[in-house]
From Swiss-Prot:
Designated name of the protein: Glutamate--tRNA ligase
Motif extent ('KMSKS' region): 236-240
Role, per record: Catalyzes the attachment of glutamate to tRNA(Glu) in a two-step reaction: glutamate is first activated by ATP to form Glu-AMP and then transferred to the acceptor end of tRNA(Glu).
Family per similarity comment: Belongs to the class-I aminoacyl-tRNA synthetase family. Glutamate--tRNA ligase type 1 subfamily.
Domain of life: Bacteria
Gene responsible for this protein: gltX
Organism from which the protein derives: Francisella tularensis subsp. novicida (strain U112)
Motif mapping: 'HIGH' region: 8-18
EC supergroup of this enzyme: ligase
Top-level taxonomy: Bacteria, Pseudomonadati, Pseudomonadota, Gammaproteobacteria, Thiotrichales
Positions that bind Zn(2+): 97, 99, 124, 126
Protein backbone atom coordinates (compact mmCIF):
# COMPACT_ATOMS: atom_id res chain seq x y z
CA UNK A 1 0.00 0.00 0.00
CA UNK A 2 1.22 3.49 -0.85
CA UNK A 3 1.92 5.23 2.47
CA UNK A 4 3.09 8.82 2.83
CA UNK A 5 3.75 10.95 5.86
CA UNK A 6 3.96 14.53 7.00
CA UNK A 7 6.49 14.87 9.79
CA UNK A 8 6.78 18.44 11.11
CA UNK A 9 9.01 19.47 13.99
CA UNK A 10 7.10 21.46 16.65
CA UNK A 11 9.84 24.06 17.00
CA UNK A 12 7.75 26.65 15.17
CA UNK A 13 4.34 27.13 13.63
CA UNK A 14 2.96 25.42 10.54
CA UNK A 15 3.70 27.77 7.62
CA UNK A 16 2.77 27.64 3.94
CA UNK A 17 5.85 25.64 2.93
CA UNK A 18 4.95 22.94 5.42
CA UNK A 19 1.32 23.03 4.37
CA UNK A 20 2.26 22.48 0.72
CA UNK A 21 4.43 19.50 1.69
CA UNK A 22 1.57 18.08 3.76
CA UNK A 23 -0.89 18.68 0.93
CA UNK A 24 1.29 16.96 -1.69
CA UNK A 25 1.80 13.97 0.63
CA UNK A 26 -1.91 13.79 1.46
CA UNK A 27 -2.97 14.06 -2.18
CA UNK A 28 -0.53 11.39 -3.34
CA UNK A 29 -1.81 8.96 -0.72
CA UNK A 30 -5.45 9.69 -1.59
CA UNK A 31 -4.77 9.44 -5.33
CA UNK A 32 -3.39 5.93 -4.77
CA UNK A 33 -5.98 4.80 -2.20
CA UNK A 34 -3.15 4.74 0.31
CA UNK A 35 -2.48 5.97 3.84
CA UNK A 36 -1.37 9.37 5.07
CA UNK A 37 0.52 9.39 8.38
CA UNK A 38 1.00 12.42 10.64
CA UNK A 39 4.12 12.21 12.80
CA UNK A 40 5.32 14.89 15.21
CA UNK A 41 9.13 14.91 15.24
CA UNK A 42 9.68 16.33 18.71
CA UNK A 43 13.11 14.93 19.56
CA UNK A 44 14.53 18.45 19.93
CA UNK A 45 13.45 18.67 23.54
CA UNK A 46 14.84 22.16 24.09
CA UNK A 47 13.03 23.83 21.18
CA UNK A 48 9.84 21.77 20.83
CA UNK A 49 6.75 23.29 22.44
CA UNK A 50 3.20 22.14 23.05
CA UNK A 51 2.03 25.45 21.61
CA UNK A 52 3.66 24.56 18.29
CA UNK A 53 2.18 21.03 18.39
CA UNK A 54 -1.28 22.50 18.93
CA UNK A 55 -0.75 24.99 16.09
CA UNK A 56 0.22 22.16 13.71
CA UNK A 57 -2.81 20.07 14.67
CA UNK A 58 -5.14 23.09 14.45
CA UNK A 59 -3.78 23.98 11.02
CA UNK A 60 -4.13 20.46 9.65
CA UNK A 61 -7.67 20.22 11.01
CA UNK A 62 -8.71 23.61 9.60
CA UNK A 63 -7.37 22.67 6.17
CA UNK A 64 -9.12 19.30 6.25
CA UNK A 65 -5.89 17.30 5.80
CA UNK A 66 -6.98 14.38 7.95
CA UNK A 67 -4.42 11.73 8.80
CA UNK A 68 -5.13 8.01 8.78
CA UNK A 69 -4.85 6.28 12.15
CA UNK A 70 -3.12 7.64 15.20
CA UNK A 71 -0.79 10.63 15.39
CA UNK A 72 2.75 9.50 16.19
CA UNK A 73 5.12 11.35 18.52
CA UNK A 74 8.82 10.56 18.41
CA UNK A 75 9.27 11.25 22.12
CA UNK A 76 6.96 8.30 22.82
CA UNK A 77 9.20 5.99 20.78
CA UNK A 78 12.56 6.47 22.52
CA UNK A 79 12.62 2.86 23.74
CA UNK A 80 12.22 1.67 20.16
CA UNK A 81 15.09 3.85 18.93
CA UNK A 82 17.39 2.62 21.71
CA UNK A 83 16.48 -0.97 20.83
CA UNK A 84 17.52 -0.45 17.19
CA UNK A 85 20.72 1.35 18.22
CA UNK A 86 21.71 -1.68 20.30
CA UNK A 87 20.98 -3.94 17.31
CA UNK A 88 23.29 -1.85 15.13
CA UNK A 89 26.05 -1.95 17.77
CA UNK A 90 25.67 -5.72 18.11
CA UNK A 91 25.90 -6.11 14.33
CA UNK A 92 29.03 -3.95 14.13
CA UNK A 93 27.18 -1.22 12.23
CA UNK A 94 27.42 1.40 15.00
CA UNK A 95 29.90 2.07 17.77
CA UNK A 96 30.50 3.94 21.00
CA UNK A 97 32.61 7.08 20.70
CA UNK A 98 34.40 8.67 23.66
CA UNK A 99 35.88 11.66 21.85
CA UNK A 100 35.51 14.82 23.93
CA UNK A 101 34.06 18.09 22.69
CA UNK A 102 37.53 19.61 23.00
CA UNK A 103 39.09 16.99 20.72
CA UNK A 104 36.34 17.39 18.14
CA UNK A 105 36.73 21.17 18.19
CA UNK A 106 40.50 20.88 17.71
CA UNK A 107 39.91 18.42 14.85
CA UNK A 108 37.50 20.81 13.14
CA UNK A 109 39.90 23.75 13.49
CA UNK A 110 42.77 21.67 12.06
CA UNK A 111 40.65 20.55 9.10
CA UNK A 112 39.54 24.10 8.35
CA UNK A 113 43.07 25.49 8.65
CA UNK A 114 44.35 22.90 6.16
CA UNK A 115 41.40 23.13 3.74
CA UNK A 116 40.35 19.57 4.55
CA UNK A 117 36.82 18.17 4.52
CA UNK A 118 35.34 18.72 7.96
CA UNK A 119 33.81 15.81 9.83
CA UNK A 120 34.59 13.05 12.27
CA UNK A 121 37.88 11.25 11.54
CA UNK A 122 36.80 7.80 12.79
CA UNK A 123 39.17 7.63 15.78
CA UNK A 124 36.81 5.36 17.75
CA UNK A 125 35.42 3.48 14.72
CA UNK A 126 37.51 0.34 15.20
CA UNK A 127 38.67 0.92 18.77
CA UNK A 128 36.09 -1.48 20.24
CA UNK A 129 35.54 1.03 23.01
CA UNK A 130 32.97 -0.01 25.61
CA UNK A 131 31.93 2.80 27.96
CA UNK A 132 32.28 2.27 31.68
CA UNK A 133 29.76 3.55 34.19
CA UNK A 134 29.95 7.32 34.52
CA UNK A 135 31.85 7.85 31.27
CA UNK A 136 30.47 10.24 28.67
CA UNK A 137 29.97 8.84 25.18
CA UNK A 138 27.90 9.08 22.03
CA UNK A 139 26.93 6.38 19.53
CA UNK A 140 27.97 6.81 15.90
CA UNK A 141 26.72 5.05 12.79
CA UNK A 142 29.39 3.23 10.76
CA UNK A 143 28.89 4.86 7.41
CA UNK A 144 30.35 2.92 4.46
CA UNK A 145 33.78 4.32 3.61
CA UNK A 146 33.69 3.72 -0.11
CA UNK A 147 31.15 3.46 -2.89
CA UNK A 148 28.37 5.83 -3.84
CA UNK A 149 24.88 6.48 -2.48
CA UNK A 150 22.42 7.00 -5.34
CA UNK A 151 18.69 7.41 -5.66
CA UNK A 152 16.22 8.40 -8.35
CA UNK A 153 14.48 11.40 -6.88
CA UNK A 154 10.90 11.69 -8.15
CA UNK A 155 11.35 15.45 -8.58
CA UNK A 156 15.08 16.08 -9.05
CA UNK A 157 16.08 12.95 -10.97
CA UNK A 158 19.19 10.85 -10.33
CA UNK A 159 21.31 12.04 -7.39
CA UNK A 160 24.61 10.45 -6.34
CA UNK A 161 26.84 11.20 -3.36
CA UNK A 162 30.19 9.58 -2.60
CA UNK A 163 30.34 7.89 0.79
CA UNK A 164 33.73 9.55 1.15
CA UNK A 165 31.81 12.82 1.60
CA UNK A 166 29.92 11.47 4.62
CA UNK A 167 31.29 10.96 8.11
CA UNK A 168 30.12 8.67 10.89
CA UNK A 169 27.20 10.67 12.20
CA UNK A 170 26.01 10.58 15.79
CA UNK A 171 22.81 8.56 16.24
CA UNK A 172 22.67 8.83 20.04
CA UNK A 173 23.74 11.93 21.93
CA UNK A 174 25.68 12.01 25.18
CA UNK A 175 22.42 12.54 27.09
CA UNK A 176 21.05 9.29 25.65
CA UNK A 177 18.61 10.90 23.23
CA UNK A 178 18.52 9.67 19.60
CA UNK A 179 19.15 12.07 16.73
CA UNK A 180 16.86 13.22 13.94
CA UNK A 181 18.42 11.45 10.95
CA UNK A 182 18.32 8.13 12.77
CA UNK A 183 14.82 8.43 14.24
CA UNK A 184 13.16 9.28 10.94
CA UNK A 185 14.53 6.13 9.31
CA UNK A 186 13.34 3.87 12.12
CA UNK A 187 9.94 5.57 12.02
CA UNK A 188 9.61 5.31 8.25
CA UNK A 189 10.50 1.61 8.36
CA UNK A 190 8.13 0.83 11.24
CA UNK A 191 5.31 2.82 9.64
CA UNK A 192 5.88 1.21 6.22
CA UNK A 193 6.34 4.57 4.48
CA UNK A 194 6.71 4.02 0.74
CA UNK A 195 7.02 7.62 -0.50
CA UNK A 196 8.71 10.52 1.29
CA UNK A 197 7.63 13.89 -0.10
CA UNK A 198 9.47 16.73 1.63
CA UNK A 199 11.27 20.01 1.11
CA UNK A 200 14.55 19.97 -0.79
CA UNK A 201 16.33 21.31 2.26
CA UNK A 202 16.38 17.60 3.25
CA UNK A 203 18.35 16.46 0.18
CA UNK A 204 21.64 16.47 2.12
CA UNK A 205 20.12 14.22 4.79
CA UNK A 206 19.01 11.63 2.26
CA UNK A 207 22.30 9.75 1.59
CA UNK A 208 22.92 9.38 5.33
CA UNK A 209 19.41 8.05 5.79
CA UNK A 210 19.66 5.65 2.84
CA UNK A 211 22.78 4.11 4.38
CA UNK A 212 20.85 3.51 7.61
CA UNK A 213 17.99 1.87 5.66
CA UNK A 214 20.51 -0.47 4.07
CA UNK A 215 22.22 -1.20 7.39
CA UNK A 216 18.82 -2.24 8.77
CA UNK A 217 18.14 -4.38 5.66
CA UNK A 218 15.04 -2.32 4.88
CA UNK A 219 13.52 -1.20 1.59
CA UNK A 220 14.49 2.35 0.66
CA UNK A 221 11.36 4.45 -0.02
CA UNK A 222 10.85 6.74 -3.01
CA UNK A 223 12.07 10.26 -2.28
CA UNK A 224 10.49 13.36 -3.82
CA UNK A 225 12.23 16.57 -2.80
CA UNK A 226 10.03 19.58 -3.46
CA UNK A 227 11.71 22.96 -4.20
CA UNK A 228 11.34 25.76 -1.71
CA UNK A 229 8.79 28.55 -1.95
CA UNK A 230 10.29 31.99 -2.55
CA UNK A 231 8.88 35.37 -1.69
CA UNK A 232 7.56 37.66 -4.45
CA UNK A 233 11.02 39.25 -4.62
CA UNK A 234 12.77 35.94 -5.24
CA UNK A 235 14.30 35.77 -1.76
CA UNK A 236 13.64 32.87 0.59
CA UNK A 237 10.09 33.08 1.92
CA UNK A 238 10.16 34.67 5.37
CA UNK A 239 7.81 36.22 7.89
CA UNK A 240 7.94 39.53 6.08
CA UNK A 241 6.56 37.77 2.98
CA UNK A 242 3.88 35.87 4.83
CA UNK A 243 5.62 32.70 6.01
CA UNK A 244 3.52 32.88 9.15
CA UNK A 245 1.45 30.36 11.05
CA UNK A 246 -1.09 29.11 8.52
CA UNK A 247 -3.84 29.91 11.02
CA UNK A 248 -2.98 33.59 10.50
CA UNK A 249 -4.44 33.20 7.02
CA UNK A 250 -7.68 32.17 8.68
CA UNK A 251 -7.54 35.27 10.88
CA UNK A 252 -6.92 37.35 7.74
CA UNK A 253 -10.10 36.01 6.15
CA UNK A 254 -8.87 33.33 3.78
CA UNK A 255 -10.83 30.15 3.14
CA UNK A 256 -9.07 26.77 3.51
CA UNK A 257 -10.30 25.86 0.01
CA UNK A 258 -8.45 28.88 -1.40
CA UNK A 259 -5.24 28.10 0.51
CA UNK A 260 -5.20 24.49 -0.71
CA UNK A 261 -6.07 25.41 -4.29
CA UNK A 262 -3.33 28.06 -4.33
CA UNK A 263 -0.67 25.81 -2.82
CA UNK A 264 -1.39 22.81 -5.06
CA UNK A 265 -0.61 25.00 -8.08
CA UNK A 266 2.52 26.40 -6.45
CA UNK A 267 5.04 24.05 -8.04
CA UNK A 268 2.63 21.53 -9.58
CA UNK A 269 0.55 21.80 -12.72
CA UNK A 270 -2.22 19.98 -14.55
CA UNK A 271 -2.38 21.60 -17.94
CA UNK A 272 -3.75 25.14 -17.73
CA UNK A 273 -6.30 24.35 -15.02
CA UNK A 274 -6.25 26.89 -12.19
CA UNK A 275 -9.35 26.07 -10.14
CA UNK A 276 -9.42 22.68 -8.42
CA UNK A 277 -11.93 21.18 -6.04
CA UNK A 278 -10.45 18.78 -3.48
CA UNK A 279 -11.85 15.88 -5.51
CA UNK A 280 -10.20 17.21 -8.68
CA UNK A 281 -6.88 17.64 -6.88
CA UNK A 282 -6.95 14.04 -5.65
CA UNK A 283 -7.83 12.68 -9.08
CA UNK A 284 -5.19 14.68 -10.96
CA UNK A 285 -2.24 14.77 -8.56
CA UNK A 286 0.99 12.98 -9.40
CA UNK A 287 4.69 13.40 -8.68
CA UNK A 288 5.71 13.66 -12.34
CA UNK A 289 4.28 17.15 -12.72
CA UNK A 290 5.98 18.69 -9.69
CA UNK A 291 8.26 21.44 -10.97
CA UNK A 292 11.92 21.10 -10.01
CA UNK A 293 12.36 24.90 -9.85
CA UNK A 294 11.36 27.09 -6.89
CA UNK A 295 8.03 28.93 -7.02
CA UNK A 296 7.29 32.50 -5.98
CA UNK A 297 4.47 33.24 -3.59
CA UNK A 298 1.94 35.57 -5.23
CA UNK A 299 -0.42 37.20 -2.73
CA UNK A 300 -2.58 38.71 -5.47
CA UNK A 301 -3.18 35.26 -6.94
CA UNK A 302 -4.14 33.91 -3.52
CA UNK A 303 -6.50 36.85 -3.02
CA UNK A 304 -8.05 36.22 -6.45
CA UNK A 305 -8.66 32.57 -5.58
CA UNK A 306 -10.12 33.51 -2.22
CA UNK A 307 -12.57 35.87 -3.89
CA UNK A 308 -13.52 33.08 -6.30
CA UNK A 309 -14.32 30.69 -3.46
CA UNK A 310 -16.31 33.30 -1.54
CA UNK A 311 -18.38 33.94 -4.68
CA UNK A 312 -18.72 30.43 -6.07
CA UNK A 313 -18.84 28.12 -3.04
CA UNK A 314 -22.05 26.64 -1.75
CA UNK A 315 -22.87 28.56 1.39
CA UNK A 316 -22.88 25.35 3.44
CA UNK A 317 -19.21 24.84 2.50
CA UNK A 318 -18.09 28.22 3.86
CA UNK A 319 -20.73 28.88 6.53
CA UNK A 320 -18.45 27.94 9.44
CA UNK A 321 -15.78 30.39 8.30
CA UNK A 322 -18.27 33.19 7.60
CA UNK A 323 -19.84 32.80 11.04
CA UNK A 324 -16.36 32.70 12.62
CA UNK A 325 -15.47 36.11 11.22
CA UNK A 326 -18.79 37.70 12.11
CA UNK A 327 -18.39 36.36 15.65
CA UNK A 328 -14.93 37.97 15.83
CA UNK A 329 -16.47 41.38 15.12
CA UNK A 330 -18.98 40.95 17.93
CA UNK A 331 -21.88 41.45 15.51
CA UNK A 332 -25.19 39.82 16.39
CA UNK A 333 -26.11 38.00 13.18
CA UNK A 334 -29.65 37.50 14.45
CA UNK A 335 -30.08 41.29 14.16
CA UNK A 336 -29.92 41.37 10.38
CA UNK A 337 -30.28 39.45 7.13
CA UNK A 338 -29.59 35.76 6.68
CA UNK A 339 -25.85 35.28 6.12
CA UNK A 340 -26.43 33.13 3.04
CA UNK A 341 -28.32 35.96 1.37
CA UNK A 342 -25.75 38.51 2.51
CA UNK A 343 -22.79 36.57 1.08
CA UNK A 344 -24.56 36.25 -2.28
CA UNK A 345 -24.94 40.03 -2.38
CA UNK A 346 -21.56 41.08 -0.97
CA UNK A 347 -19.20 38.46 -2.45
CA UNK A 348 -18.45 40.54 -5.54
CA UNK A 349 -17.26 43.44 -3.38
CA UNK A 350 -14.78 41.64 -1.09
CA UNK A 351 -11.58 39.61 -1.32
CA UNK A 352 -11.57 38.20 2.22
CA UNK A 353 -14.01 37.26 4.94
CA UNK A 354 -12.53 39.99 7.13
CA UNK A 355 -13.61 42.51 4.49
CA UNK A 356 -17.00 40.83 4.27
CA UNK A 357 -17.65 41.23 7.99
CA UNK A 358 -16.32 44.80 8.07
CA UNK A 359 -18.20 46.01 4.99
CA UNK A 360 -21.43 44.34 6.11
CA UNK A 361 -21.45 45.57 9.69
CA UNK A 362 -24.17 48.18 9.06
CA UNK A 363 -26.62 45.38 8.25
CA UNK A 364 -26.33 44.03 11.80
CA UNK A 365 -25.30 46.95 13.99
CA UNK A 366 -27.45 50.03 14.53
CA UNK A 367 -24.41 51.88 15.84
CA UNK A 368 -23.32 53.25 12.48
CA UNK A 369 -21.02 56.21 12.09
CA UNK A 370 -21.25 58.60 9.16
CA UNK A 371 -18.33 59.01 6.80
CA UNK A 372 -17.52 62.72 6.89
CA UNK A 373 -16.53 62.92 3.24
CA UNK A 374 -19.70 61.13 2.16
CA UNK A 375 -21.85 63.46 4.28
CA UNK A 376 -20.10 66.53 2.90
CA UNK A 377 -20.50 65.31 -0.67
CA UNK A 378 -24.09 64.03 -0.62
CA UNK A 379 -26.03 65.73 2.20
CA UNK A 380 -27.26 69.17 1.02
CA UNK A 381 -29.73 71.79 2.25
CA UNK A 382 -32.52 70.18 0.24
CA UNK A 383 -31.83 66.65 1.52
CA UNK A 384 -34.19 67.00 4.48
CA UNK A 385 -37.21 67.38 2.18
CA UNK A 386 -36.09 64.30 0.23
CA UNK A 387 -35.77 62.24 3.42
CA UNK A 388 -39.27 63.33 4.54
CA UNK A 389 -40.74 62.21 1.21
CA UNK A 390 -38.79 58.91 1.34
CA UNK A 391 -40.13 58.19 4.82
CA UNK A 392 -43.65 58.90 3.65
CA UNK A 393 -43.28 56.54 0.69
CA UNK A 394 -41.53 53.77 2.65
CA UNK A 395 -44.15 53.85 5.43
CA UNK A 396 -46.83 53.13 2.82
CA UNK A 397 -45.26 49.77 1.87
CA UNK A 398 -46.46 46.52 3.40
CA UNK A 399 -44.20 43.62 4.47
CA UNK A 400 -44.59 41.72 1.20
CA UNK A 401 -43.69 44.74 -0.91
CA UNK A 402 -40.55 45.27 1.21
CA UNK A 403 -39.26 41.86 0.10
CA UNK A 404 -39.03 42.98 -3.52
CA UNK A 405 -35.84 44.97 -4.36
CA UNK A 406 -37.43 46.22 -7.59
CA UNK A 407 -40.35 47.74 -5.70
CA UNK A 408 -37.93 49.45 -3.32
CA UNK A 409 -35.77 50.71 -6.17
CA UNK A 410 -38.87 52.14 -7.84
CA UNK A 411 -39.80 53.96 -4.62
CA UNK A 412 -36.43 55.73 -4.71
CA UNK A 413 -36.95 56.56 -8.39
CA UNK A 414 -40.49 57.80 -7.73
CA UNK A 415 -39.25 59.98 -4.87
CA UNK A 416 -36.70 61.56 -7.21
CA UNK A 417 -39.48 62.42 -9.65
CA UNK A 418 -41.66 63.81 -6.86
CA UNK A 419 -38.80 66.01 -5.65
CA UNK A 420 -37.86 66.91 -9.22
CA UNK A 421 -34.23 65.82 -8.82
CA UNK A 422 -32.06 63.17 -10.42
CA UNK A 423 -31.93 59.63 -9.05
CA UNK A 424 -28.45 60.21 -7.62
CA UNK A 425 -29.71 63.15 -5.53
CA UNK A 426 -31.96 60.67 -3.70
CA UNK A 427 -30.05 57.39 -3.84
CA UNK A 428 -26.70 58.65 -2.58
CA UNK A 429 -28.00 60.62 0.45
CA UNK A 430 -30.20 57.61 1.25
CA UNK A 431 -27.14 55.34 1.19
CA UNK A 432 -25.28 57.64 3.58
CA UNK A 433 -28.27 57.73 5.92
CA UNK A 434 -28.82 53.97 6.13
CA UNK A 435 -25.23 52.63 5.81
CA UNK A 436 -23.03 55.50 6.98
CA UNK A 437 -21.15 55.70 3.68
CA UNK A 438 -21.69 56.23 0.00
CA UNK A 439 -20.99 52.61 -0.88
CA UNK A 440 -23.33 49.63 -0.71
CA UNK A 441 -24.87 47.02 -2.99
CA UNK A 442 -27.75 48.01 -5.29
CA UNK A 443 -30.01 50.37 -3.33
CA UNK A 444 -33.08 48.13 -3.70
CA UNK A 445 -31.19 45.11 -2.38
CA UNK A 446 -29.64 47.14 0.45
CA UNK A 447 -33.09 48.37 1.54
CA UNK A 448 -34.52 44.85 1.44
CA UNK A 449 -31.67 43.34 3.49
CA UNK A 450 -31.84 46.09 6.11
CA UNK A 451 -35.60 45.76 6.52
CA UNK A 452 -38.28 48.40 6.92
CA UNK A 453 -37.78 49.07 10.63
CA UNK A 454 -34.03 49.73 10.32
CA UNK A 455 -34.45 51.91 7.23
CA UNK A 456 -37.18 54.06 8.79
CA UNK A 457 -35.25 54.41 12.07
CA UNK A 458 -31.99 55.36 10.33
CA UNK A 459 -33.64 57.79 7.95
CA UNK A 460 -35.36 59.46 10.91
CA UNK A 461 -32.06 59.68 12.77
CA UNK A 462 -30.26 61.11 9.72
CA UNK A 463 -33.02 63.65 9.25
CA UNK A 464 -32.50 64.83 12.83
CA UNK A 465 -28.68 64.73 12.91
CA UNK A 466 -27.58 65.55 9.36
CA UNK A 467 -30.33 67.82 8.08
CA UNK A 468 -30.43 70.46 10.78
Amino acid sequence: MITTRFAPSPTGFLHVGGVRTALFSWLYAKNNNGKFILRIEDTDLERSTQEAVDAILDGMSWLGLKNDGEIYYQTKRFDRYKEVIQELIADGKAYYCSCSKERLEELREYQQANNLKTGYDGKCRDANYVPQQGESYVVRFKNPQDGVVSWDDAVKGRISISNHELDDMIIQRADGSPTYNFCVVVDDIDMAITHIIRGDDHVNNTPKQINIYKALNANVPVFAHVPMILGPDGAKLSKRHGAVNVMQYREDGYLPQAILNYLVRLGWSHGDQEIFSIEEMIKAFNLEHINASPSRFDFEKLKWLNKHYIKESKFDDIQTEVEYHFAKTGLDISNGPDLKELVAVMAEKVDTLVELAEKSSYFYSDDISYDENAVKKHIKASTGEIFVKLLENFEALDAQQWQDPDVLHNIVSTTAEQCQVGMGKVGMPLRVAITGSGQSPDIGITLKLLGKNKVVARLTKALEELCK
